[in-house]
Amino acid sequence: MVDWVVLLLKAVHIYCYLIGLSNFEFDCRTGRVFKSRRCTIYAFMANIFILITIIYNFTAHGDTNLLFQSANKLHEYVIIIMSGLKIVAGLITVLNRWLQRGQMMQLVKDVIRLYMINPQLKSMIRWGILLKAFISFAIELLQVTLSVDALDRQGTAEMMGLLVKLCVSFIMNLAISQHFLVILLIRAQYRIMNAKLRMVIEESRRLSFLQLRNGAFMTRCCYLSDQLEDIGEVQSQLQSMVGQLDEVFGMQGLMAYSEYYLSIVGTSYMSYSIYKYGPHNLKLSAKTSIIVCILITLFYLDALVNCNNMLRVLDHHKDFLGLLEERTVFASSLDIRLEESFESLQLQLARNPLKINVMGMFPITRGSTAAMCASVIVNSIFLIQFDMEFF
């Protein structure tokens, strides 16, 4: 039977090579991560080509507005800012892959090792992969459709600019998808780890009620202590991977959040403009209007899915801490080794609490996400009011 998850991941893997995002190779069967001359040269040439087209686009002074055939200055400024940020984000992503090539290779090695140790992870993350793949593919397909729809009014400069925007958009989408996949694996591993910890807690609670503490009791406590130490080691590895993600994807994460922020504000304003002026006055066809509406919806959904993925990791970690707190309701003390294992794990978590940050500056929490959404709404309203007053 064909495993569509494996085929999908292989397709994304090849896509990363073709677009120049991956500058090293790996073998999932052996866990080997290595550099190759072929991959390095191809990625370097692809990145140079993107850089040359960007330079040409900025020196050619082509039309930056390929969506609205009739637009005011504010529309053009918003489109320039959104497009410029997307290009900068793509360039920083590419540059970061070269500067942190070694760290990225180590992260991939850890991810493959985690996947090989727990083959059941594949069945746990398949629907998350499918959802993310569908959204990403739909966004890129609609972007290409919009670009093809505008071909009849483009010159050479506009064509090159369009190619640049598509390339950097694909690069950013792939980089965000890679981050999503790693977080998804960490989420699944946390679920497995929580299930194991729950079994240890339940067994320890049962043992705490036993009055007769013979050799079998001691043996069972030693077994549970080993299980608890294994859980603590896995939790430490997961937390290390989260730290590696922040280090490797930190700058990309900052650019992605900035892109999400400004793009949501910009698309909110563009939606208002279409409502205010009407598609006809903006010379926007019905087909383009429908595509834009679907694209905006998918863009919002993509931001929601990415953010929820990280928040769920924090939820699983909170459940992990809650399970450990149940140790206080045990009827009596257990074997000294098991007690020390519990204390060691709690000390490990207290000394190094799990945090997900963007460049170590912006914490990813429900509170910070709500504050960001409120800021997006306020700035969208401000931009709309500015349009109402001056245009």
Swiss-Prot record:
Topological region Extracellular: 26-39, 96-127, 187-284, 385-391
Entry's Gene Ontology BP terms: monoatomic ion transmembrane transport; sensory perception of taste; signal transduction
GO cellular component annotations of the record: axon; dendrite; membrane; neuronal cell body; plasma membrane
UniProt note on tissues of expression: Expressed in neurons of the terminal external chemosensory organ of larvae.
Pfam families reported for this sequence: 7tm_7
Family membership: Belongs to the insect chemoreceptor superfamily. Gustatory receptor (GR) family. Gr22e subfamily.
Full protein name: Putative gustatory receptor 36b
Source organism per UniProt: Drosophila melanogaster
Lineage: Eukaryota, Metazoa, Ecdysozoa, Arthropoda, Hexapoda
